[in-house]
Amino acid sequence: MDDRNSVSVGVLGSYGGRNLGDEAILTAMLDRLRADRPDVRIVVFSRDPAYSRAAHPDVEVVGWEGVCRERISEHLRRLSVLVLGGGGILYDTEARRYLRLVRTAQDLGVPVFTYALGAGPLTDETDCTWVRATLADAAEVTVRDEESKLVLEEAGLTRPITVTADPALLLTPGEGGDELLRAQAVPRDVRLVGMSVREPGRAAEHLDEEGYHQLLANVGDFLVHRLDAHVVFLPMERDDMRHAHAVVSRMADADRCTVLHGTYRPQQMLDIVRRLDLAIGMRLHFLIFAALAGIPLLPLPYAGKVFDFAQQIGAPALRGVVRETAGLLLAEVDRLWDERPDRVAHMTTRTAEMRLRATGTADRFLAYLDRTAPRPLVLAAAPTPAAG
């Protein structure tokens, strides 16, 4: 395709970082864009170009980390629009990295559309300044939850902000979940409870590692005895495995646990989640997958985005993941299991509403694209002359 005359959409997020949540977002976004605008040339800006090319061989991939302004400008100036998002990329010390590239695009006259962004924690004045300076000039600003809208407003952004929902809510499952579990020697003749952990870090700076490891070990042992269950830890990124093993090492019933070690695509992980009987976890997109699969779930909110999601789907959620909440947490697990038919029915209704809002993000972007970069005209074929 001659990109000088084509419509070109760039997509910038935490892609190529081998986080299944971010990859689920990208996959769902690309699926909708390809379905509606097959004429569009897509360029994904990736942290690991080789990984992204293997996952999405039908799009162009550009590495951007550690690339100077002059070189990245060669790719940006060819775009019709740059999509920032989705995913939680606007937080302290990280936001400025993405927004420098956004400002470069804007300086080149490339419009920017923010797509169901997640924001927070965002208190560093340098990052807040970047937010105000760049997003004020965006064509449109959409965020995935009310928490993110509040964070951007507190950072000083005064323009209209539209709340939609996480793009990963539109992910479709793949196949082979049973085979993937069998390959990891997960038994299939018992109840399966999925658990999700994560590492402390800038996005979870108040997380007490030792405390939450022991808390989840207590929960795991309770599940084994209360439900006669096998506990499966589902890593959403590579470092989750280390924390999962730390939890298992503190359990009395470690032999009733499996930590998955495979490499999975988002669609495969969603299909694995569909095989669970119960889901308890910290990672937002693990919880989104459970909601999509109709699995009763208990969020463990380490950050506002998880608590916000729990509220939106009507799931119970304790404030914080600390050892002192062990008794309350075990009681909530017990209640969730006993009330699971009603809980799932309620959650399914709420999830359908969120999927409509996620569809709304795509609709808004595609409408913007149609206004600024119209679809190519398709000329009707001339009628075939009648045989004489």
Regions of interest found by a model, annotated:
Residues 1-388:
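Active-site anion-handling motifs in enzyme catalytic cores
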